[in-house]
């Protein structure tokens, strides 16, 4: 039955083979889909695949066809509709098959195709497709009148497993009463192909001593007959093993996996086995076809054999004092594979090489052990050395032997050699007191002949004598003092180099260390010859003495002033002992600044003393590093010396004078224009005293207001000083009012903030501005010139007086000191923002106050 049509050309234009994955459906070349017989559509039959392939390019494509069950809806018959008629069934011959390699006779009848329309028409039958008009051509034909289908030759299934032909039924005049019919001819398989191994010869490796069941390898064979039939069901087996005994391998009949059947594989006995294997189809039955192949199994080596010495003992000889010389080669036997880690030997010296005179290495070419001398031997000390050497492989031992190291004994005979003198020990010492008289003789360096053990016949000479202090006797090695020996000059030890030689000219080198014993030949001295005493901050200085002699001739020291009892030194200075090596020098009277020479005698514990002329500088400074020495005249002529603080005081005085003159000039020009004060000049200093406030007042910061009095200008040019205020909180300048009836200007200090009073003109008035250009919170109280002069004059005078005092005290008094707590005081009143405002502008609101505030305003007005 015709189902539908698929457009195959859109998918694959060059398809040479078209067939369906489901035998219930047939596909024609034009894409028509037919059912081969009546089927019941179920969920399993909901889809099938059309397979398209090109046999030349081996290109394949698939088209998925989905089938939907459609129920026909019957309409109500109308009079004008035609009467429904039963459709006849399509012609559909049963599928047929042809045995592979059929012997005929040919042509061989297959089946008859016949159309039901032959009852009404004269039908001619024809076929087309592969095997008819396509390669392979002329394998099939059909009789035109009867529809009998014939095969003309035998067919190989492995080449053409099936043929899809299209049958046509037509009338003589060309009318086609039937749809084309797809006819599938299957080729029945015959067991005509023997299985073939993928390789003609296989090669595998397995380690010796492997356990039973160890996998060696797997073989594989293929069969071109029809899959999933008895013709392609294969069985594997081992036909023969060489060497035949013992049987060591087995093969799985289905998978072809070869495994070990014994653990007695020994590479040292047999390193390769050859197996003849067979594969047979028909599930291994005797009539099945079979093929054989060769499998070679190589036995891999493991370190199951220990290396063994060819001899158990060896004898070698070597001359004394020889180094880096080969004295013996030892060989080993090893059955493992040559030139592998299982065969290569590692030699070690197990015993007898405690002094490190020997080493043994492996010759990589011969695997022999090479014994060498790396440190000279001494015949006089040892004439024979017995060594015990061992050998192992590079790879770990995997055998069953308990001992893993093979050992041998080597006897090394040391041969005597005529040697030169021996300097032993190389460094020798002799102790001599320093300052011994020139010409003193003492023992010197000694070398000896190792053959005789004596120093007879050995000659000595110096090779190095840095100071030329000694001479060496060439026959005995005795040293003679040529110059005065000074222990302090050579740090207690003086080294000279000696060359000792015998009559044959053989030499040895040695060092003679002369240890100089100390004598008390040095008095203690004071290294620091100049002492600075800052008179303003200290009254003494500490001096320290040192003694280059050894401690036994050193401290404790005794310090004293050199001079008679009534000398000027004793009247001016005093020494006080601090510890064993230091004393404190202090002046007694109020000495002038200047430089003094004080002789100080220091005596060590044994009475050796030395006088040091100590230069003491009395300086006007804070630290000794700040001192710049100024000479002092000891006669009646005195010079006036100005310090830096005195110069600063002079400059400040000049600046103060300039400020006073500037203030007077400004006051004279602006006094006539001053407006009357709004508030009275009462005892409260123009502040409203509020007594009924129980809470703290508000902290307010206001914009810059005109300071109605005359301000002091900034620093005078050319003087180098500034008169200003320092910022304490947030960089703001404040003028605080004291409630006790005095108005003060307070200057505050905070690191890094300096401001100056600058003269500005604004509306004809002089104001106090911050040098930083920011707002300045000021008290707008009006000061008169007399009040300002009363306030500034005593303070400036006090600062000028303090400039010549000590720098430390001056710095402490030059700033407002901040205290954490000053005790509990009386309850403070609240001063609001309006009580501090002194502008004469913006007070018109007082004229419009209510009745409650008029009395208060009249009270505050200055009459």
Swiss-Prot record:
Glycosylation site list: 120, 346, 495, 579
Distribution of this protein across tissues and organs: Expressed in esophagus and rumen. Weakly expressed in epithelia and cardiac muscle.
GO biological process: cell-cell adhesion; homophilic cell adhesion via plasma membrane adhesion molecules
InterPro entries according to UniProt: Cadherin-domain_protein, Cadherin-like_dom, Cadherin-like_sf, Cadherin_CS, Cadherin_pro_dom, Cadherin_Y-type_LIR, Catenin-bd_sf, Desmosomal_cadherin
GO molecular function annotations of the record: calcium ion binding
Family annotation (SMART domains): CA, Cadherin_pro
Cytoplasmic side: 666-863
Modification Phosphoserine, positions: 826, 830, 835
Topology, Extracellular side: 90-644
Domain of life: Eukaryota
Keyword Repeat part of the UniProt annotation: yes
Membrane topology summary: Single-pass type I membrane protein
Positions of transmembrane segments: 645-665
Listed GO CC annotations: desmosome; plasma membrane
Domain annotation Cadherin: ranges: 90-197, 198-309, 310-423, 424-528, 529-644
PROSITE patterns found in the cross-reference section: CADHERIN_1 (PS00232), CADHERIN_2 (PS50268)
Keywords attached to this entry: Calcium, Cell adhesion, Cell junction, Cell membrane, Cleavage on pair of basic residues, Glycoprotein, Membrane, Metal-binding, Phosphoprotein, Repeat, Transmembrane, Transmembrane helix
Record note on domains: Calcium may be bound by the cadherin-like repeats. Three calcium ions are usually bound at the interface of each cadherin domain and rigidify the connections, imparting a strong curvature to the full-length ectodomain.
Self-association state and partner proteins as the record states: Interacts with DSP, PKP2 and JUP. Interacts with DSG3; the interaction may limit the interaction of DSC3 with p38MAPK family members and therefore repress p38MAPK signaling activation.
Role, per record: A component of desmosome cell-cell junctions which are required for positive regulation of cellular adhesion. Promotes timely incorporation of DSG2 into desmosome intercellular junctions and promotes interaction of desmosome cell junctions with intermediate filament cytokeratin, via modulation of DSP phosphorylation. Plays an important role in desmosome-mediated maintenance of intestinal epithelial cell intercellular adhesion strength and barrier function.
Record's protein name: Desmocollin-2
